[in-house]
Amino acid sequence: MRWSNCYIPTLKEAPADAEVVSHKLLTRAGMIRKLTSGIYIYMPLGLKAIEKTAAIVREEMNRAGALELSMPMVQPADLWQESGRWEFYGKELLRFQDRNGRDYCLGPTHEEVITDLVRGEVRSYRQLPINLYQIQTKFRDEIRPRFGLMRGREFIMKDAYSFDRDEAGADKSYWAMYEAYQNVFKRLGLRFRAVEADSGSIGGSFSHEFMVLADTGEDTIAACTGCQYAANVERAEVAPPAVPATLPAVGAIEEVPTPGKHTVEEVCAFLGVPQSALVKTLILVADGKPVAALVRGDRELNDVKLKNLLKCDELELAAPELVQQVTGAPVGFAGPVGLNVERVFADHELLASDGWITGANKGDTHLRNVSLPRDAKIERYADLRVITPADACPRCGQPIELTRGIEVGHVFKLGTKYSEPLKCTFLDEDGKEKVMVMGCYGIGVSRVVASCIEQNHDADGIVFPPPIAPFEAVLCCLDPKNGETLGKAEEFYAELKAQGVDVILDDRDERPGVKFKDADLVGMPLQLVVGGKGLARGIVEAKDRRTGEKTELPVEGFAEAFRTWRAAVRAGWGL
C-alpha cells in the first residue's frame, strides 16, 4: 500500500467534544469520524485495526472449538418477553415497530436469539456440547454516550454462547473460553488482568471481566499483593471483621443538636469525632419499595452488593420527599432508631463495635450511644461496602491495591437463566428431558482498539502494539521524486511484503517532518527512513515507535537485519 493511494486524513487538532485520549487520537489519526452521538464511521485505517483485532479473536475462538455464525441484529420482541427481559432491560434497548405494528428491538446482545435457535435444533445429548459465536455490530441506547469508541451506542462485539448437558460440562466450557480470552489479549500485546465480576443485567452464577490496565480506566480493580485474587470493586469482597466475644456496655441514647449539619463531614467536625464513629443510614428504593442500608461513616455503600443481596431488578437512592416521609426528617438526619422502613440491612463491619452516632430521624438532631443490637431492627448483617486499600485480601489477608482498568471482555456462567424460561431442553441417555446449562462470552472488539490506545500512547500520538496496528511498518521515502531513492524504497517494500509484514510506503511529496509526525501519530510500530544521505552511507534508519530507540540497518543484507530487528521490537511487546 502506498500512502499516496490511501485515505488517511490526519488532523492537527482534536475535536472539542473529545474528552479521552483514545477519542482524540483516533480522530486526529483519521481512523474514525463521528456521524452522530455515540455512532462513528470507521475510516480505512480504523477498520484495519478493528479487523486485525477481530482476526485474532476469531483464531482463538476457532482454536477453542467454537463455531462461527451470524445472527440478525433485529430481534422480535416476543423472544425478549419470553425471557422476561423486555421490560427489565430498560431504555438502553432500542425498540421499534414494523409497518404491521409488530414489536422489535436492535440487539445489544443475543442470548434470546441463540437460545431460540438451539432449542429448535438440538434434541439429544449426543449433539452437546456446542459453542456458537459471532462478530457483529450491536446497538445499546446509552443515556450518555461519550469517550468515542469507549462508550458508544453502536459497537462491534464478539459474543459466544455455550450449551452443555450439565454443570460439569458448563464449567469446562467456561474455563476453555477463559483460557481463549487470555490467549487473545496476550497475542494483542496488551497489559491486562482477569478479575472476578458482577454479572449485571446478563445474569448467571459467576463471571470474570478482562481488564486492560490503564490510568484512564472507568473501572477500579482490587488486586491482592500476595495472591492471585483480583476483582472489580463492585464485586470485591471485604472480609468479615473480628468481632469481640463481648462489647463494652453502652449508655442510654442521648439526643445531640446538630443544626444545619447534613453531611458526615459536617456532623463529625461539629461533634469533634472521627467519621468512623458515625453510622450512615441510606434510604433507597428497591423495586418500588423503601429499604435502608447502614455503613460506617467513613465507608461507601456498594449498591451492587446490596442489589444482589435483595435480588431486586432496580435499586436507586430515595428521593428527598420519600426520605422525609419514612424518617420524618430532611436528608442528612436519617437513623436506624425508630425508622419507618420494613427492611433494614447493615454492613457486617458494624458488628465489631458499638455505641454509634446516628441520625435521629429528626431535623437538626443526631443520637449518641446507639447500640444497633439493642436499639435498631436489623434484618441482616452482610458485606455491603466498597473495599479500600486499607482492607486485607479476603483470601489470604495480604494488603489490597487499587488500580484502574477498562473492561474489554466478560465471561459469564449463565446456568439456566435463559434456557429454563425459553424451554431449551434435550433428552439424556435415559430419554429424560433436561434443561441445557449455558455460558456466554463477550469481547468488545472496537472497544479493544480504543482501550489499547488508552494504555499505549505518548505526546506524539498512538503507540500501537504490532498485532493491532493498521500497518506494522512504514517506509518513509524522503525524496520520492528521486528515482534512485524511490526505487530502493520499493525494493525494501517488496522485501518486507515477502516477509509477511503489513507495510505502507510513504511516497507523498511532503517534508520529512510531516511524514515523521504522521507516522508517530498513527502509531506505526516499525518506522524505516529511506533517504539519499542514508543510502550513500549504505544504511536505512529504523525507529522503534514504542521506545523511540533508533538503529541503522545495512542496505546490504537488509532483509536479515530487518528480520532480527523486528523480532527484537516484538519481544519488547512480549510477543
Curated annotation (Swiss-Prot):
GO MF terms held by the record: aminoacyl-tRNA deacylase activity; ATP binding; proline-tRNA ligase activity
Q: Which Gene3D superfamilies match?
A: Anticodon-binding domain (3.40.50.800), Bira Bifunctional Protein, Domain 2 (3.30.930.10), YbaK/aminoacyl-tRNA synthetase-associated domain (3.90.960.10)
Going by the UniProt record, its keywords in alphabetical order are: Aminoacyl-tRNA synthetase, ATP-binding, Cytoplasm, Ligase, Nucleotide-binding, Protein biosynthesis
One biological process term in Gene Ontology: prolyl-tRNA aminoacylation
**A GO-annotated cellular component:** cytosol
Compartments in which it is found: Cytoplasm
Question: Chief localization class?
Answer: cytoplasm
The protein's enzyme class: ligase
Task: Tell me the protein family, please.
Answer: Belongs to the class-II aminoacyl-tRNA synthetase family. ProS type 1 subfamily.
Quaternary structure, per UniProt, is: Homodimer.
- Which HAMAP family does its entry note? Pro_tRNA_synth_type1 (MF_01569)
Function, as annotated, reads: Catalyzes the attachment of proline to tRNA(Pro) in a two-step reaction: proline is first activated by ATP to form Pro-AMP and then transferred to the acceptor end of tRNA(Pro). As ProRS can inadvertently accommodate and process non-cognate amino acids such as alanine and cysteine, to avoid such errors it has two additional distinct editing activities against alanine. One activity is designated as 'pretransfer' editing and involves the tRNA(Pro)-independent hydrolysis of activated Ala-AMP.
Name used for this protein in its record: Proline--tRNA ligase
What taxonomic classification does the UniProt entry list for its organism?
Bacteria, Pseudomonadati, Thermodesulfobacteriota, Desulfovibrionia, Desulfovibrionales
What is this protein's gene name? proS
